[in-house]
Swiss-Prot record:
Residues 26-488 form the UvrD-like helicase ATP-binding domain. HAMAP family: AddA. The gene is addA. It comes from Streptococcus pneumoniae (strain ATCC 700669 / Spain 23F-1). Its cofactor is Mg(2+). PANTHER family: ATP-DEPENDENT HELICASE_NUCLEASE SUBUNIT A (PTHR11070:SF48), UVRD / RECB / PCRA DNA HELICASE FAMILY MEMBER (PTHR11070). GO terms for molecular function: 3'-5' DNA helicase activity; 3'-5' exonuclease activity; ATP binding; ATP hydrolysis activity; double-stranded DNA binding. Keywords: ATP-binding, DNA damage, DNA repair, DNA-binding, Exonuclease, Helicase, Hydrolase, Isomerase, Nuclease, Nucleotide-binding. Heterodimer of AddA and AddB/RexB. Its EC number is 3.1.-.-, 5.6.2.4. It catalyses: Couples ATP hydrolysis with the unwinding of duplex DNA by translocating in the 3'-5' direction; ATP + H2O = ADP + phosphate + H(+). Residues 515-802 form the UvrD-like helicase C-terminal domain. This is ATP-dependent helicase/nuclease subunit A.
Length: 1216
């Protein structure tokens, strides 16, 4: 097809006018049209939240295809795999529709080819592109195409540690070992080993991986801050800060004297206030830095007189207490800043004195890092295993050093498109530059939604182009998409009100002006006063907070407030739970949130990506078990195992065993004491009673058998042996959240198996890997389980990006920002390089022996201070963007939820606004989102803000006030008042009579088991008799049966029962890896993992199982593994017909496929049979029970049921 010319500016303008004058219900905006059709230059689309950027991107691609561009000529980068999939699906629909609409034969054929090529198009993440690229061109760098990705963090950590220790030993024993020893000691802290240094090395390495050339950055930028250090200018800056701080203090005190101080006319502190004002008043325009520093020193000294209470308003009058508290709080804030400035004077002096020494240390660090980076790179090349960043680095290296490859891609790509451009890092930016011809880039993003700095994303890449294109259109075209089609006017007005007053270039990195303000464009949503955004504050006093912290089970007031609003939406407005989202900045308080919601019976679905797998109790128990098997001399792990439900030793028993020390030993560990107790070889052997001795013997025997088994079997087999020997897997399944716990244990076995398949073998290395993951403060992802269909969504703000919900609650507004990065021993900056805290050894000059002659002083380098300030501004800017993302997720109504004392907050004072923004100090001193929102509410009271704040106290959060949806546990304890003992025997006898009457009336309910299995409830379904493996072929036909008089087989040969075959077959079907092609060889390998005897394995017909996957149902399962659930436990309430009491049914479903409006349930049976109808009749009731459980769980009525019959020579699939 011949290329059709792209539209000119005039043609685009005509198109915009025509769209504006059209009668369409939902019109494209002029900016959207411009973004879709503009061509011939670099284009940056700044697309605010809900402005339809995905629509614009898809329409632009479709327009190019319709003009004759091939889909293979477009490079389209998305932030996630999911986004790429969604874009491909959207394009598939649009191209198909265009084919149907057009009459142009050439266009039809062209678009048909594009549709066929769509699966192979360069649409995906940068990582997916670089993998394909390196697979094709890696030979240029001698990289084999069969490389693998180090996605397993634990494996990566093991490799990293091995390389670190190799490089460490080389430096520790090398020619520069003295200077290296100094570096080592600088990061040792209280420890005596290399862990402190190793932690900083890994941190720097992660940073280097985000640069386009790590070694180049190390050599050119790592020491830049030391090279350009200017202490004279720093002293001048500090003097300016001191001036400003003293003037702020003067303004505060004068305002206080002119207003509130009149209520405290004779208070003693006012004399000191006047004294300080006189000191500040002595300064003038001629005062130099020395004068300002002297006044600062005298002011700070005055504040410290009278044990620091010289300026404290100590009024005890109840009516004046709020005024006094507000003054004291602001005074503390002011003097905290003055104290910091005073400290900075001293620190700057030390920084200058030790600058050269710190520089030398940094050079040593630079050398070590360079050697480590190169050694680790070489090690990964030996393994032919790389991180994603390595793949990108090699891709850049090829594109830079092989012009013919670069030019071929530049000629191939008509346009280089990137979505979520604000989250691009420097590697990706360099790659995009190399793939582009310089004027064919299309970049879409929103700097206000850049929230991935922790992944080394740099919003300044976007911001630099935004500023450049805005000032000089010749550089590139800037298009602003501001119209929001997602949210109500109430949500948008509230968001604008917040960020117009909060975000600017100084704090926030951008000016939130008319270029960034959200514009309401969803004509389907009419204004509704009920949807006005609310800032809800749980009114807590100090005692209330203390009470809350006393017990984990007591619900926080903040969550009760949220639950009350959720129930109000659900019950009064008919809002479905799934329309409500709870957003948090982190998952640290998720346990409290989940507890509160469950107590009120509110279904909840989490984002499923908590990296706290190793913290789950059941996994911790198993890890301690493995530690003990590896080395029983570890007391902590041994006690954990003995106290666990697997063995159940209590504190009394452990105390008795801990006293079993041999008389001739000074110190013994617990395991040795257990051996002593077994041998009765201790002076305290009398403490070991018979029951304890038997319990101990059982424990020691089992532990010994596990240790022996571990020597000759895989980790996977060992873990399953532990589960089976002590029924631990079954035990955790009966606990609350049992399916998730079982999934965690199952995943532990799989992860152990994966570990041993990645060239690492043995229990010792597995435990070391886990300990290293924990030591590095990492964790593994938790295991996802099937969520409820209608449930409140609980997720982090990061996870919510790109999603939308009718009702959004932003929780924990009072949760402090995470500032761990600014407390590190090392802070890095792309501009300044390394900032480090230097440990100086200083002489004290002490003469007395009891005083130390030297002390160690931690001195942050000048670059460290500069980087710290840069990091603080970047962190606060990112927190603002995080709040923006959260607020713009709401479609109808937004709730911002926090807590605080109304009495204290109402009297809090803030500096006046400047240029319509909060004072920069107010913004930078905020500890959390709530501080910003409250300051805006107070400073801009007269502005009629589009959000209102409301305090909710304890009296409004009683059970009665909250609502009636709570579901009380049937085992809930009665109050002590109900259990009081009777005062008289007569009353006691009356109570006994009542109990007897009650027991008689409810005998059926008392005798009813509280938990039953499907086979136990045949009173409901008589045919339900789950007797897997029982032979029913020829049932009832004894005629003609040959009678045998052979002697029974009394040999010791292992006998195999049908039940054993059935159990093993089920486990095999559960273990089969459906992501790989199934062959007889792969099934044989999987069968080896099944926990059973070889005799049972020999009875399983693998050909038959392979044949099943060739059936219609088998093929459907293979094609829909993302919808497949296998071995799924379930529990369901049923009612006993006789007693009319509820009981729990528990069971395990062999498997089912879960679709949007349908479920396909299947169950394997290994029974022998003549006719399939025999098994259908037998198991019809059981499947009906499973059907009911699934229907109730997912609210889906359409359920197909199949029996997979494996009891004959050929497999049969029967629909029930």
């Amino acid at each position: 097809m011949k290329l059709i010319p792209f539209l000119s500016e005039e043609e685009i303008q005509k198109l915009q006018e025509a769209e504006a004058n059209s009668s369409k219900e939902q019109k494209k905006t002029a900016e959207q049209i411009e973004a879709i059709y503009t061509s011939g230059q670099n284009i940056l689309v700044s697309a605010s939240a809900g402005s339809g950027k995905t629509f614009v991107m898809a329409e632009r691609i479709l327009n190019q295809l319709a003009r004759g561009v091939e889909i293979s000529q477009l490079f389209i980068s998305t932030f996630t795999v999911k986004a790429a999939t969604e874009l491909k699906e959207r394009l598939e629909k649009k191209i198909s529709k265009k084919i149907q609409e057009t009459d142009d034969v050439d266009l039809k054929q062209h678009l048909g080819r594009q549709l066929a090529d769509l699966p192979n198009a360069a649409i995906g993440t940068m990582d997916s592109f670089t993998q394909k690229f390196l697979g094709k061109h890696g030979y240029l760098l001698d990289i084999a195409p069969n490389f693998r990705i180090l996605q397993n963090q634990s494996e990566q950590l093991l490799l990293e540690n091995e390389v670190f220790h190799e490089v460490f030993e080389a430096h520790y024993q090398g020619k520069q070992k003295e200077t290296f020893s100094h570096l080592l000691k600088n990061f040792a802290g209280r420890g005596k080993d290399e862990r402190g240094l190793r932690q900083q090395v890994y941190k720097i390495y992660d940073f280097l991986q985000s640069t386009s050339n790590p070694q180049k950055w190390l050599s050119e930028s790592f020491l830049k801050g030391f090279e350009k250090a200017d202490f004279t200018s720093e002293k001048e800056k500090l003097t300016e800060q001191i001036k400003q701080a003293l003037w702020d203090l003067e303004s505060f005190f004068r305002y206080h004297l002119d207003n509130d101080a009149k209520e405290f006319a004779k208070a003693a502190y006012l004399e000191n206030v006047q004294l300080i004002l006189d000191e500040i008043g002595s300064l003038n325009q001629e005062s130099d830095s020395q004068a300002y520093q002297a006044v600062l020193a005298r002011v700070v000294a005055i504040s410290k007189e009278k044990n620091g209470r010289a300026l404290t308003n100590a009024s005890r009058k109840a009516d004046l207490k709020p005024l006094a508290d507000a003054y004291n709080e602001e005074r503390k804030t002011q003097f905290a800043k003055l104290g910091q400035l005073s400290d900075q004077i001293t620190i700057l002096d030390y920084q200058e004195r030790y600058h050269q020494d710190t520089w030398e240390l940094a050079k040593t660090f630079q050398t070590f890092m360079s050697h480590f980076v190169e050694a680790y790179r070489q090690r990964k090349r030996q393994e032919n295993a790389f991180e994603f960043a390595d793949i990108s680095h090699y891709t850049i290296e090829i594109l830079e050093n092989f012009p013919q490859v670069r030019e071929s891609y530049q000629e191939r790509f008509h346009e280089v498109m990137v979505d979520e451009y604000q989250d691009t890092n420097h590697i990706q930016e360099r790659m995009l530059e190399l793939l582009s011809n310089g004027h064919n880039r299309f970049m879409v993003g929103d700097i206000k939604q850049s929230i991935y700095r922790f992944r080394q994303a740099d919003p300044q890449i976007f911001n630099e182009k935004f500023q450049r294109y805005a000032q000089n259109p010749q550089e590139g075209k800037l298009i602003l998409l501001k119209a929001n089609f997602r949210s109500s006017s109430e949500v948008l007005s509230a968001t604008n009100d917040v960020f117009e007053r909060l975000m600017d270039q100084e704090v926030g990195e951008i000016n939130y002006d008319n270029k960034h303000q959200l514009v309401f464009a969803n004509t389907k949503l009419t204004p509704n006063p009920d949807n006005k955004a609310e800032f809800l504050l749980y009114d807590k006093d100090d005692t209330g907070e203390e009470e809350e912290s006393q017990t984990e089970t007591k619900l926080t007031g903040e969550m009760r407030l949220v639950i009350k609003e959720i129930l109000k939406l659900h019950q009064e407005k008919g809002v479905a739970f799934k329309e409500i989202a709870l957003l948090t900045s982190s998952r640290s308080r998720n346990d409290q949130i989940l507890l509160a919601l469950s107590e009120y019976g509110i279904p909840v679905k989490t984002d499923g990506e908590q990296n706290n797998y190793l913290q789950s109790l059941e996994v911790q128990v198993m890890l301690d078990t493995l530690r003990v098997i590896h080395n029983p001399l570890q007391d902590y792990a041994l006690v954990a195992l003995m106290k666990s439900p697997m063995f159940g030793f209590d504190e009394d028993e452990l105390a008795r065993l801990s006293l079993q020390k041999a008389e001739d030993k000074v110190h013994e560990n617990l395991y040795e004491k257990l051996v002593n107790a077994q041998k009765m070889a201790s002076s305290q052997k009398g403490l070991i009673h018979t029951a304890l001795a038997e319990k101990l013997k059982q424990f020691m025997d089992i532990l010994a058998s596990w240790r022996l088994y571990a020597k000759t079997h895989s980790l996977y087999d060992l873990i399953w042996k532990i589960y089976n020997d002590r029924f631990y897997y079954d035990y955790v399944g009966a606990l609350p959240n049992g399916p998730a716990r079982q999934a965690n244990l199952y995943a532990l076995a799989l992860r152990a198996d994966q570990f041993e398949k990645s060239n690492f073998k043995g229990l010792s290395r597995f435990i070391r890997m886990i300990d290293q993951v924990l030591e590095a403060q990492h964790d593994l992802a938790s295991v996802a389980v099937a969520p409820p269909k209608d449930a409140v969504e609980l997720m982090t703000i990061h996870k919510s990006k790109g999603l939308e919900f009718p009702y959004v609650f932003i929780l924990n507004m009072d949760q402090d920002f995470n500032k761990q990065d600014s407390m590190s021993e090392v802070i890095l900056s792309r501009q300044n390089g390394l900032g480090v805290k230097y440990i100086a050894k200083m002489e004290t000059g002490a003469v007395e022996d009891h005083y130390p002659k030297t002390i160690k002083l931690s001195i942050p380098s000048l670059t460290y201070r500069q980087n710290e300030e840069e990091l603080q501004l970047a962190s606060y800017s990112e927190q603002m963007r995080l709040l923006y993302v959260a607020m713009t997720r709401a479609e109808k109504k937004l709730y911002l939820v926090g807590k605080g004392s109304r009495e204290k907050l109402e009297v809090k004072q803030y500096p006046a606004a400047k240029n319509g923004k909060l004072n920069s100090n107010t913004r930078l001193q905020a500890r959390n989102f709530q501080d910003w929102l409250w300051a805006i509410s107070k400073v801009f009271t007269k502005d009629k803000l589009n959000f209102s704040y409301r305090f909710i106290g304890e009296d409004q959060l009683t059970r009665e006030a909250i609502g009636e949806l709570e579901t009380k546990s049937p085992l809930q304890d009665s109050s002590q008042a109900d259990n009081r003992q009777s005062d008289t025997i007569k009353e006691a006898l009356e109570m006994l009579k009542e109990v007897e009457v009650y027991n008689t009336l409810h005998r059926a309910a008392i005798e009813l088991p509280s938990v039953q299995t499907p086979s136990q409830i045949k009173k409901f379904y008589e045919p339900v008799m789950d007797m897997e493996g029982v032979e029913i072929a020829g049932q009832g036909q004894s005629v003609g049966k040959k009678i045998s008089f052979d002697l029974p087989d009394f040999s010791t040969k292992e006998k195999v029962t049908g039940a054993e075959i059935g159990s093993a077959t089920h486990e095999l079907m559960q273990r089969i890896d459906l992501s790989q092609q199934l062959t007889l060889a792969s099934l044989t390998e999987t069968l080896k993992q099944v926990q059973t005897s070889q005799a049972v394995r020999d009875k399983i017909n693998l050909d038959k199982i392979l044949a099943f996957f060739d059936t219609v149902l088998g093929q459907e399962i293979l094609a829909n593994t993302d919808h497949l659930y296998r071995e799924q436990p379930f529990s369901m309430l049923k009612r006993d017909q006789k007693s009319q009491e509820d009981f729990v049914v528990r069971g395990i479903l062999d498997g089912y496929l879960l679709y949007e409006n349908k479920i396909v349930l299947f169950d394997y049976k290994t029974d022998r049979y003549d006719e399939p109808s025999q098994l259908v009749d037998r198991y019809r009731g059981q499947l009906a029970l499973y059907e009911e459980a699934l229907s109730r769980a997912y609210s889906i009525e359409n359920i197909e049921k199949y029996l997979i019959l494996l009891g004959k020579d050929e497999v049969q699939v029967v629909k029930v």
